[in-house]
């Protein structure tokens, strides 16, 4: 519908600017290409505690890619990975999109990896009804980007700490 027209425009622009782009499913054999891309991504982004936590989480996901049964997709242009997304099925209705990275200097790269990953997941798991785009980590820009996809609902996030009895 009309509410996602801006996203379609970004994807159309990306396709015009990168007519030879391709997607490739992430496998243990090509996972290093995602590691390399995310390393470059972090080189150009300002460090903060949330970035450090995310970096650690992504490294762990890469280290345990097969054991965690994650799905992943890379967006490739001119032989270079310019975006990737990874996630895992939560149950028969929900899919968790854990990580999404793209070079923001490439117009439409985020919208395109989001679209292509969503299509791949919809094809692989046709029974799914919801994609969980996860937490915005309190970042206004990330929150705005996630809300631009017109989510069905936003859930409150809670942290729990285990306390010793006594």
Which residues make up each language-model segment?
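C-terminal "cap" of GNAT-fold acetyltransferases
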Residues: 5-8, 162-166
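Aromatic (often tryptophan-rich) hydrophobic motifs at membrane interfaces
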Residues: 72-163
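Short, contiguous, pocket-lining structural segments
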Residues: 2, 6, 26-33, 53, ...
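A generic secondary-structure signal
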Residues: 13, 40, 61-64, 120-124
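A structural signal for short coil/turn segments at secondary-structure junctions
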Residues: 18, 66-68, 125-126
């Amino acid at each position: 519908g009309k509410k996602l027209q801006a996203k379609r425009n970004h994807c159309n622009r990306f396709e015009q600017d990168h007519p030879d782009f391709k997607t490739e499913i992430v496998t243990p054999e090509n996972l290093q290409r995602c590691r390399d891309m995310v390393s470059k991504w972090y080189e150009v982004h300002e460090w903060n505690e949330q970035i450090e936590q995310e970096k650690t989480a992504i490294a762990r996901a890469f280290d345990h890619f097969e054991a965690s049964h994650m799905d992943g997709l890379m967006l490739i242009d001119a032989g270079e990975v310019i975006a990737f997304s990874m996630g895992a099925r939560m149950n028969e209705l929900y899919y968790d999109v854990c990580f999404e990275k793209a070079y923001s200097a490439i117009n439409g790269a985020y919208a395109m990896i989001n679209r292509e990953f969503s299509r791949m997941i919809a094809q692989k798991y046709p029974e799914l009804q919801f994609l969980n785009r996860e937490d915005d980590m309190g970042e206004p820009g990330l929150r705005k980007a996630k809300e631009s996809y017109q989510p069905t609902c936003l859930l409150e996030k809670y942290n729990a700490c285990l306390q010793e009895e006594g």
